[in-house]
Amino acid sequence: MAPQNPLLGTWRVESFERWTADGTLTQPLGMPPAGYAVFDDTGHAFVQLGRATTTDLSPKDIAQSLMAYFGPYAIDGDELTVTVEASNMAAYIGSHQVRRFARDGDALTLGVEGQYRAKLRRVTA
């Protein structure tokens, strides 16, 4: 029997934090941010994060905050790798995006230490 997939389902982003070069922690997508990460049972990931439309930003600014990518994913211990098929971020296309993750019930934290951290909550399994 294969081990249960700890990421399977739809996860809503609750916070997105990024560290600046000098080590300052920022919230570039505002609070609360908007978006979801979906990990399906066929082994595909779909990630879309951005600023919430309730902010005082223009529609153009909100659209420019969007980070989206998708592709097949693999899990190895506490490490997630998404092989990016397409993205609105040119540098991601064809890359392997590797993230450490920790899950506590319906709460998920993933990111790259010293770069960024996203906290999400399970919507569906």
Question: What are the language-model segments listed below?
Answer:
Residues M1-A125:
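Lipid interaction determinants
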